């Protein structure tokens, strides 16, 4: 009986419940979709999701971030002013730092998969309990890489 116990499915169910209790749609939908994929023949797409999911997620996030520029909601004048405002210059510097940390995070997660579980648990807890957004694993891994020197 214990051989049939799927710890990964239980973890997904716990995440689904956490998402529901915290009213976090992102965690709820992600866990629900993954549960459906896991318990159906769709589980054959897991290698594809694992290979391309992160890049697809980053692409969708980038499209979302750039949409105000494309739609004109953020005017060209506002964009140009961002290069003369102190607050905007600090924002640009922080954006550069975060992008660099994210790059380090991707490398660390690829080279040291043993840290991925901890990063994911921390990120999901932050999303579910602190109403954060699930961009944390890359930045968290980037920060971790600074601490462990990788």
UniProtKB/Swiss-Prot annotation:
InterPro entries: UPF0756_TM (IPR007382). The keyword Secreted does not apply. It is a multi-pass membrane protein. Pfam families: DUF441. It comes from Acinetobacter baumannii (strain AB0057). It is found in: Cell membrane. One of its GO terms (cellular component) is plasma membrane. The keyword Cell membrane applies. This is UPF0756 membrane protein AB57_2455. The chain crosses the membrane at residues 1-21, 51-71, 83-103, 115-135. Belongs to the UPF0756 family. Keywords: Cell membrane, Membrane, Transmembrane, Transmembrane helix.
């Amino acid at each position: 009986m214990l051989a049939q116990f799927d710890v990964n499915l239980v973890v997904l169910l716990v995440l689904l419940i956490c998402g529901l209790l915290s009213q976090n749609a992102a965690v709820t939908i992600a866990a629900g979709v993954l549960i459906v994929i896991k318990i159906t023949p769709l589980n054959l797409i897991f290698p594809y999701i694992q290979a391309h999911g992160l890049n697809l997620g980053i692409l969708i996030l980038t499209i979302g971030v750039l949409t105000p520029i494309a739609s004109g909601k953020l005017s060209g004048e506002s964009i140009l002013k961002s290069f003369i405002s102190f607050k905007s210059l600090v924002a640009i510097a922080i954006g550069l730092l975060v992008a660099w940390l994210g790059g380090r995070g991707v490398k660390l997660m690829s080279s040291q998969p043993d840290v991925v579980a901890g990063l994911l648990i921390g990120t999901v807890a932050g999303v579910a309990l602190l109403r954060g957004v699930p961009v944390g694993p890359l930045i968290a891994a980037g920060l971790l890489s600074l601490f462990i020197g990788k």
